[in-house]
Amino acid sequence: MTMNRRDFLRMSAALTAAGMSPSLFAATKEQFTIYGAPAMPSVTIAVAATQGKLAKQADVALEIWRSPDQLRAGVASGQFKVMMSPSNVGVNLRNQGQQVGMVNILTNGITQLMCKGRAITSPQELVGKKILVPFKNDMPDIVLQALLKKLNIDINKVDITYAATPTEAIGLFLLKDFHAAILPEPMASAVVQKAKIVGTEIVRGFDLVKEWGQAFNTKPLIPMAGIIANEEYFDAHKTQFELLHQDLSDALNWIMANRKSAAEIGANYLPAPEAAIEMGLDGARLTVTKASELKNEIMQFYETLMEFNPKLLGGKLPDDKFFLA
């Protein structure tokens, strides 16, 4: 069917009368949705999505997944193309046949040990203690168990209770007689503030990342999470991903210079108040590092996980093609 000038003008007039400009159709931006985790690096993504250059050419949106299981389901269904993920989950998905690869790392260690009353100052002091851990068999649990195994601490002598989410862990921690909880930022800072309201003192325990570095003789960093992407989607949008990398780097610089404003943005996405987000920025060890630039550290982390439990990676280490950027 062809359209002459008179028909085009009639359609334009009708669209205008309906409050729709024909130019809107020509200017429609491609959707670029990033599925973020309920943790601090999503603040970096949120700022990049609102202030970055990519937003000028694409409709950049951030949506938060609630649990690693929802993340896995989103990837398996094909709905999730760009997503923040615990660093082991990307490998696991790839080894299950999902065509995903790693784009970057956004935190070098986001998990904190929060203690009730008195600080637990060493991993050895966890013996005999009641500890809350969210996300069984995912990153907080993995780091704790691998560290204890490396230090020859019997995991059966630590009383671990699992919570479905960090938010649930906070509620249980404050209401029940747990000695400590392992929480990602900003939920670690949120529990400090919530505890004050109910008259409980919460303090930070030993630094998990530093203890990890000493135990495994590595740099004091754990490449815990970053952005992974569908390979085909990445290959078709390499220019956009380069812009995203610059936007994320600029966003992190802006966040550290404008913490209060950054917390206001983050509170729109995370289950934590602005004050907790602002307080938790330092402990989140935020970074924006391309996967290829941190490849040695990432592979060393994966090798540690393989020794601890190969199932965490789906049974094998990733190939070089896993590192997309």
What are these regions (language model features)?
Residues 53-57, 211-217, 287-295:
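Short, solvent-exposed loop/beta-turn-alpha elements that line the ligand-binding surface or hinge
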Residues 87-89, 168-171, 175-265:
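Pocket-lining segment of extracytoplasmic ligand-binding domains
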Residues 48, 74, 129, 147-151, ...:
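Structured segments of extracytoplasmic/periplasmic soluble domains
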Residues 7-26:
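N-terminal export signals
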Residues 27-154, 160-161, 179, 185, ...:
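Short, glycine-/small- and polar/acidic-enriched structural segments
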Residues 299-325:
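Conserved C-terminal helix/tail region of periplasmic/extracytoplasmic solute-binding proteins
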Residues 1-3:
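Secretory targeting signals
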Residues 234-308:
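Secondary-structure end/capping motifs
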